[in-house]
């Protein structure tokens, strides 16, 4: 039939062997903060405080993460998995490949965070199938332009030579989540070419993408000297 020459990619071997051209302009945001007792000794991030509706106050408890009562809109097909489980990482990578997603932007809460434990394995598995990994810098405790610079240095120094480390036009890509929490003029110290702690024209230069919540905030990205 018409699909007679189409290669099926049902298993690991098929994905590894197939001649796949991934779209490295298609990026997913990948959260590697989940844990479970069998791998990590406890549940992580499957539980969550219940958020109150606007205008309400008080303590309405939390979702326990136990007995399938998890903080998730849909129950995951892979169950309450651990982000440190190598088999889970392999399955996630292959889901991305089947969707032709070329880059995973992994959430980053700092060097000592639980999520950092799986970054090396994520990079290794991505490299096997030609996928790439970039980083999504979250509002970690103590985040400032200075500590963001320190984290950029750590990421580039630790992972920058890995074949799966994503670069575009020779530069790594970083997303800065909730960048509006810090004043644009403060960010400019880091991202302006003449800033006090600038990464520009250094080995830590990159493409830095901020976050706005409304159109009126778009000029703040330019003031911060971010790239988008």
Where are these regions (language model features)?
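Glycan-processing catalytic domains of CAZymes
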Residues: 9-228
């Amino acid at each position: 039939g018409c699909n007679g020459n189409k290669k099926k990619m049902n298993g690991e071997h098929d994905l590894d062997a197939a001649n796949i051209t991934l779209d490295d302009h298609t990026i997913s945001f990948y959260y590697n903060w989940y844990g479970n007792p069998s791998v990590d000794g406890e549940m992580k991030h499957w539980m969550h405080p219940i958020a109150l509706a606007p205008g309400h106050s008080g303590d309405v408890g939390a979702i326990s993460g136990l007995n399938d009562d998890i903080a998730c809109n849909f129950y995951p097909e892979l169950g309450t998995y651990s982000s440190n489980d190598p088999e889970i990482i392999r399955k996630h990578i292959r889901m991305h490949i089947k969707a032709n997603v070329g880059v995973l932007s992994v959430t980053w809460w700092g060097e000592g965070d639980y999520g950092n434990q799986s970054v090396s394995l994520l990079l290794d598995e991505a490299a096997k199938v030609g996928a790439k990994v970039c980083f999504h810098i979250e509002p970690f405790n103590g985040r400032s332009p200075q500590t963001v610079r320190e984290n950029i240095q750590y990421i580039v120094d630790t992972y920058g030579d890995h074949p799966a480390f994503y670069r575009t036009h020779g530069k790594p890509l970083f997303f800065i989540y909730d960048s509006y929490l810090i004043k644009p003029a403060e960010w400019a110290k880091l991202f302006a070419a003449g800033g006090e702690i600038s990464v520009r024209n250094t080995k830590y230069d990159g493409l830095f993408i901020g976050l706005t919540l409304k159109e009126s905030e778009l000029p703040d990205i330019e003031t911060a000297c971010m790239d988008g």
